Regions:
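C-terminal motif of bacterial Sec signal peptides marking the signal peptidase cleavage site
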Residues: 14-18
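A residue-level marker of the well-folded mature domains of exported/periplasmic proteins
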Residues: 20-419
Length: 419
């Protein structure tokens, strides 16, 4: 904030502000010193989607080091942010500073934690006051947690990611500036389409029902998917929601969001197993779960769902251990830790009597959380496990989503600068 140029008569205000005092947010005050300080709420340090969002934010704001720009986004949360510059629509080149950042993990070990974000925002605001010019969050839940801080500055810009219905209402009321929609309907429909194709033994399961109509009457996913054969991933693009277009999406039920180009197919009902990494996750509960429940009938699935604690894999793996061979025709896994894919495959290989010599055709599809190595890179090797003929990942394009979030922030700042 620009305090040094304030009149002498405002000395008391200067002293208060320099000690982290707060007043309602305004662009005039935020931009006065030509420095934009932001605070970043990180979901999970070693999560590739979290890292991709962090990379997108820092790249857009100029705070990702030049030496890191050519690297994979997977290590972005472990990188050190640098002082950057950003030229806005008013012709001013602002200095950009990541004044605070941190993983939002609770005492039980659960990451992406909304309540922790509330405490974090309170602490950072108490420390810096109006010296923070805006907040950015790796997801909507933490953004909502932040605005719930007891000392939250009225009008403080904050940007989320996930397009939770509650966040859309906050965008309508001006408390959150924007979010990124993961295209939940396309993710849910795409996951079930791919699982159905594999169960039914359809040729070209990543094409049938995606770029061409389903051979078994399930229609065609309306959103474009991009298939990467190297790591067996099926990715759908994200899109931005701000005050300009929020009315197109707010207040919609899951039934409103169902892809009408997907239709009820003709193959028999089968039993499938599906895990959710955290029973308390806002995005999964409000966006994904209701869609899956509707799509289950469309794809003739009898779904057994299991819900994790967000801290470790124990609840999901113990449930999986209890399954018997023949209980399920497909397994759809939403991991807590993205490095845990191999442990799930080991359990399933034992259950299904699968070996490299006698691989199983039972599909195993990871969803929304992509398998990574300890270094945070997409784990192409685990996705080629020779014990399984059908291993895939279905989710959103994390890198494209991170870039969109970064651009959304810059667009907002440009609008403020032009006002």
């Amino acid at each position: 904030m620009k305090k040094s140029l304030l009149p002498i008569v405002a000395l008391a205000t200067v002293v208060l502000a320099s000690c982290g005092g707060t007043s309602d947010w305004s662009w005039a005050e935020a931009s006065a010193d030509e420095t934009l300080n932001y605070a970043l709420l990180i979901g999970q340090i070693d999560h590739n989607d979290s890292a991709a969002r962090t990379a997108g934010i820092r790249t857009a704001l100029g705070t990702r080091a030049a030496a890191d720009l050519g690297k994979s986004t997977s290590s972005a949360n472990s990188e050190v942010a640098v002082e950057g510059t950003l030229e806005l629509a008013d012709g001013v080149t602002y200095k950009t500073v990541e004044i605070e950042s941190g993983e939002q993990k609770n005492t039980a070990g659960a990451t992406w934690d909304q309540q922790t974000a509330t405490s974090t925002a309170e602490n950072w605001t108490a420390k810096h006051g109006n010296d923070i010019d805006f907040f950015v969050s790796n997801n909507d839940g933490m953004a909502e947690g932040a605005i719930g801080a007891s000392n939250w500055i009225k009008g403080m810009p904050i940007f989320g990611y996930d397009s939770n219905e509650s966040t859309l209402q906050y965008i309508k009321s001006g408390q959150i500036m924007g979010t990124i929609n993961q295209n939940a309907s396309a993710q849910a429909g795409g996951l079930y389409m791919l699982a159905r194709n594999c169960i039914d033994g359809v040729a070209n399961p990543t094409v049938n029902g995606f770029s061409e109509a389903s051979a078994n009457g399930y229609g065609k996913i309306g959103s474009e998917y991009n298939y990467n054969e190297t790591n067996e991933s099926m990715l759908v693009n994200n899109f931005t929601i701000t005050a300009d277009n929020v009315d197109q999406y707010a207040g919609k039920t899951s039934a409103d969001l169902i892809d009408t180009s997907v239709t009820k197919g003709t193959t028999e009902t089968v039993k499938v197993w599906q895990s959710y990494y955290n029973a308390a996750d806002t995005f999964l509960n409000s966006s994904m779960k209701p869609l899956f429940q509707l799509y289950a009938d469309t794809f003739n699935f009898d779904v057994t769902a299991t819900f994790g604690n967000g801290a470790d894999e124990s609840l999901a793996t113990s449930n999986l251990e209890a399954a018997q061979k023949g209980d399920y025709d497909a397994f759809m896994i939403n991991m807590v830790k993205t490095t845990a894919a191999a442990s799930y495959l080991d359990i399933l290989a034992t259950k299904l009597d699968a070996t490299a010599e006698t691989p199983t055709n039972t599909p195993v599809i990871f969803w929304n959380r992509q398998a990574t190595t300890e270094a945070g890179e997409v784990d192409a090797d685990v996705m080629k496990d020779a014990r399984f003929n059908n291993i895939y990942y279905v989710g959103f394009d994390a890198v494209q989503g991170g870039q969109l979030q970064g651009q959304m922030i810059v667009d907002y700042l440009n609008a403020q600068a032009k006002a």
